[in-house]
Curated annotation (Swiss-Prot):
The keyword Cytoplasm applies. This is Yop proteins translocation protein P. Keywords: Cytoplasm, Plasmid, Virulence. Belongs to the SpaN family. It is found in: Cytoplasm.
Length: 455
């Protein structure tokens, strides 16, 4: 059974006075009878009939709007052919006069008005509910909130609630109920906004799964076909097309394998992204539909693999590389560079630091007609050595000044260095003149023999 909850956020709240309704009604009847009997003691003053406003209640004597006025009947504003639900009129006096009441009588009249106002509101809500009850079969599975209806239907439940919100209605105007409720959008800033909220049904796991399945089928059905493909060809087996989701299987089978391969080859990134976005459940359903009822003995077409689509085929290589090109020439220097190992910068810097620690080099350049450069070395094994380099027109004179032991070691080293230099370029060497001509000829002969042997 539906639970009915009524609330009126804009009307003043009515708090009961602690007495039951029948006791309060008895007091009101007694006070009304007392006022009716004392009618002759008052001085009547005829005025136009005005309805009682909520802000006029509870005012003291001497203020503006003192006293209570009788309510005007509502029958004058009714329309024919419609069921009228409005405010019940107050007890009309015979002469429709105003009375100056005492505080006790005024409080009793206020309580009577509040009680009648609450009863009128209950009658109004009850009439609205009775009018909406014939529409209950049509509202089954519909959820309407703030003037809008949800797209996804839901199943009715036994614990549903019906919430009806009504704005306050002026007591001077009658309330008319139409055949269909008028639902207007809720505007918090506007006073008197009317909102009817229906909440029928509750979403269950079965309904959620059904909604997801329907949305997925709708999305697949709205996918556009290829430009050159007007309809789906019948290439699927009958056992597959007889499944519940036959349109899914038909769309999966209708796409030719060659077309898939061409699209994947032209747009590999797009094909990869689309394949990642496919739902795993859809892939499982499609594979199950394709395998059901298919004879494994027949030849089946396998979809191309991604690596085969991305890599060029052997027969397409000449077309891709139609322009002729020459292979790069490999020189002996390239082989030499390939055999060399790259030295680390840290090792070179360490070697330079060690050499600077072992050598003490001083350069001295003197000016004059003959430029002489002196190089002072302090070696741990040879000791102090001075090298003088003099530039003679057309020649370069180098002189070593050191101890005998140092000179002997240097002479041995110079001889080894001279032999290495002679092998590289013998024509650019000049030997010192000596008394032994045989030794000179022997040195020259030795140099030329080695050079000819290498050639």
């Amino acid at each position: 059974m539906n639970k009915i909850t009524t609330r009126s956020p804009l009307e003043p709240e009515y708090q009961p006075l602690g007495k039951p309704h029948h006791a309060l009604q008895a007091c009101v009847d007694f006070e009304q009878a007392l006022l009716h009997n004392n009618k002759g003691n008052c001085h009547p003053k005829e005025e136009s009939l005005k309805p009682v406003r909520p802000h006029d209640l509870g005012k003291k004597e001497g203020q503006k709007g003192d006293g209570l006025r009788a309510h005007a009947p509502l029958a004058a504003t009714s329309q024919p052919g419609r069921k009228e639900v409005g405010l019940k009129p107050q007890h009309n006096h015979q002469n429709n006069h105003d009375f100056n009441l005492s505080p006790l009588a005024e409080g009793a009249t206020n309580r009577a008005h509040l009680y009648q106002q609450d009863s009128r509101f209950d009658d109004r809500v009850e009439s609205i509910i009775n009018a909406l009850m014939p529409l209950a079969p049509f509202l089954e599975g519909v959820t309407c909130e703030t003037g809008t209806s949800s797209e996804s239907p839901c199943e009715p439940s036994g614990h549903d609630e019906l919430f009806v919100q009504q704005s306050p209605i002026d007591s001077a105007q009658p309330v008319q109920l139409n055949s269909k409720p008028t639902v207007q959008p809720l505007n918090p800033a506007a006073d008197g906004a009317e909102v009817i909220v229906w909440s029928v049904g509750r979403e269950t796991p079965a309904s959620i799964a059904k909604n997801q399945r329907d949305s997925r089928q709708k999305r697949l059905a709205e996918e556009p076909l290829a430009l050159h493909q007007k309809a789906l060809p019948e290439i699927c087996p009958p056992a597959v097309s007889a499944t519940p989701d036959d349109h899914l299987v038909a769309r999966w089978c209708a796409t030719p394998v060659t077309e898939v391969a061409e699209k994947s080859a032209r747009f590999p990134y797009k094909a990869t992204v689309q394949s990642e976005q496919l739902d795993m459940t859809e892939l499982a359903d499609r594979s199950q539909h394709l395998t059901d009822g298919v004879d494994s003995s027949k030849d089946t077409i396998e979809p191309p693999r991604p690596e085969k689509l991305l890599l060029p085929r052997e027969e397409t290589l000449p077309e891709m590389y139609s322009l002729s090109f020459t292979a790069p020439v490999v020189t002996p220097g390239d082989h030499l560079l390939a055999t060399m190992r790259a030295t680390r910068l840290a090792s070179v810097s360490e070697q330079l630091i060690q050499l600077a620690q072992r050598l003490a080099v001083e350069l001295e350049l003197r000016g004059g007609s003959s430029q002489v450069t002196q190089l002072h070395l302090n070696l741990p094994e040879l000791g102090a050595i001075m090298v003088r380099i003099a530039e003679i027109p057309g020649k370069l004179h180098v002189e070593l000044i050191a101890s005998r032991e140092a000179l002997r070691i240097l002479a041995q080293g110079s001889y080894d260095l001279l032999e290495r230099l002679q092998r590289i370029e013998p024509t650019q060497l000049d030997f010192q003149a000596s008394d032994d001509s045989e030794q000179e000829s022997r040195q020259k002969r030795h140099v030329y023999e080695e050079w000819e042997a290498e050639e």
